[in-house]
Amino acid sequence: MAQADRPARGGLAARPMRGASFALAGLVACAACAAVVLWLRPAAPSPAPAGAVAGGPAAGVPAAASGAAEAAMPLPAALPGALAGSHAPRLPLAAGGRLARTRAVREFFDYCLTAQGELTPAALDALVRREIAAQLDGSPAQAEALGVWRRYRAYFDALAQLPGDGAVLGDKLDPAAMQLALDQRAALADRTLGEWAEPFFGDEQRRQRHDLERIRIANDTTLSPEQKAARLAALDAQLTPDERAQQAALHAQQDAVTKIADLQKAGATPDQMRAQIAQTLGPEAAARAAQMQQDDEAWQTRYQAYAAERDRIAAQGLAPQDRDARIAQLRQQTFTAPGEAIRAASLDRGAGG
């Protein structure tokens, strides 16, 4: 999973054409995320501090006390907005109804973590308990899944104590810094997740070490281009067939993203960019781009209406505290979906509002 999106910035000059470019650029950015060395950041969004419930045995809270706290917590009535219309991945079972130690368990938890921006830590724990119970109620795997969730939360709580939440700081691909970040996160996963560290992060860590070695080879000034190519080929030969296929798909996506970015820099129209997206990333991606464009144009229209009312309030000569409170109330009433009010506030700051 990924980190929380940064709010968009800009001024009141935002118009539908800018919205079209914003939407298309957003799709390009989403594709580009896959082309980055993903392990420069922690692998999933970091939950808020979990408190007694999330700490669990892995964080030093007795299991009995943790279970009592969980039982007392009310369950959320409905899925939060980020998960509306979706279903949690299936939790895998092994023989005897026990929880299978596979990455699918992490994918289940990462699905729930998608909603963390809308929920308090207690509500997030309640959501996870409800989703676990929906699949495993009364089985031995239910208690196991709750225990693994507590460990996973403890992992993120500890990760938040590292500089930059365990991310590589700075803009350069510094192999030493990357190695340190990888080692720190691996040690932390072993300490908090125990036997679950391998199914949760094992494949990812091996890919990360492979990526790191590629960077080291590319940065080695003592090697000729031919020597670098030979070493990279030898390194890639160590990959499994599935890993090689994934790498080839990633390279193809990188090429597509580069072409689309070049079009954007050259001032291509939204229609031209959508055509390129359809050609390089497929018709489904082009359809998503069109929908993103429509959604963003609708948002820009709402923002412009809001900005006019905001400016009217600002012109009334109110005391700064009263003016800001009125504008904040207007913003919250106008932008109700998660993240919208933050984006509007950022645009206000860019416009000097």
Swiss-Prot record:
<comment type="function">
    <text>Involved in the folding of the extracellular lipase (lip) during its passage through the periplasm.</text>
</comment>
<dbReference type="GO" id="GO:0051082">
    <property type="term" value="F:unfolded protein binding"/>
</dbReference>
<keyword id="KW-0442">Lipid degradation</keyword>
<keyword id="KW-1003">Cell membrane</keyword>
<keyword id="KW-0443">Lipid metabolism</keyword>
<dbReference type="GO" id="GO:0016042">
    <property type="term" value="P:lipid catabolic process"/>
</dbReference>
<feature type="topological domain" description="Periplasmic">
    <location>
        <begin position="41"/>
        <end position="353"/>
    </location>
</feature>
<keyword id="KW-0472">Membrane</keyword>
<feature type="topological domain" description="Cytoplasmic">
    <location>
        <begin position="1"/>
        <end position="19"/>
    </location>
</feature>
<keyword id="KW-0143">Chaperone</keyword>
<feature type="transmembrane region" description="Helical">
    <location>
        <begin position="20"/>
        <end position="40"/>
    </location>
</feature>
<keyword id="KW-1133">Transmembrane helix</keyword>
<dbReference type="Pfam" id="PF03280">
    <property type="entry name" value="Lipase_chap"/>
</dbReference>
<keyword id="KW-0997">Cell inner membrane</keyword>
<keyword id="KW-0812">Transmembrane</keyword>
<dbReference type="InterPro" id="IPR004961">
    <property type="entry name" value="Lipase_chaperone"/>
</dbReference>
<comment type="similarity">
    <text>Belongs to the lipase chaperone family.</text>
</comment>
<dbReference type="GO" id="GO:0006457">
    <property type="term" value="P:protein folding"/>
</dbReference>
<comment type="subunit">
    <text>Monomer. Interacts with lipase (lip).</text>
</comment>
<protein>
    <recommendedName>
        <fullName>Lipase-specific foldase</fullName>
    </recommendedName>
</protein>
<dbReference type="GO" id="GO:0005886">
    <property type="term" value="C:plasma membrane"/>
</dbReference>
